[in-house]
Amino acid sequence: MIFFWKFFFVQIDKYDFNNLNFRHIDFTNYKKIRGLIFKENLFKINNYHVNSFEFLNFSKNLGGKVGINVSKKNIFNWFKINKYKLYFLWSSELTARRLINILYNYEFINSSLEKKESNRLKEIILFHIKRLLLEFNNLKYYDVDSYQLKAFVLSSIILKKDFTKVLFIVKKIISYQIDNIGMHKSYNILEHSKFINNLKELKNIILFYNIKNGDFLDEALGKLGLVLNQY
């Protein structure tokens, strides 16, 4: 997939990260995160729930200063030690998951941050967007999962991109993910369900921002739903 945008993050305040929580169904594994969340150096643990920032969903449920401090400390420290690493931590898949989890919890985390901390959080988000789009450019349509696709769309919203090309790419990627009878090509019912959930979130994003020509999502959801109803 050949796709590239030039973007320059020079004025942090011009980017809006509010109202970007479009979560439909929460697939977070809270049971596993519960055993990790209060570890002193959580950010150093080589664990999927840490490296994907899925722990932020648990922190939000904790609420208050405790939840915000857990979120802030581990985002900032994780980024500090991993920013320039090149291995799997910055794969398109993990980058997309982290970006989504930060954006979906942004308003909670940012609610009591000082200006300097808030700017730091924004810089981390923009760094993730940059890394995501650079990786995204090297992927084939069939290599993009629905989380990467959702992160791509959210990034496009933040960067105020023309959605004519964005929707063309979204439609292409979705067509590569579904077979002729409407089954997700993982042929795994859980992944099929997650795919439906992410397409519903994409639909809500498009409706919220009044973006036109997103009807193809209804068609895809209809086919996927018919297959799911057979289980």
Which positions does each model-derived feature cover?
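Aromatic-lined, polymer-binding surfaces characteristic
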Residues: 44-221
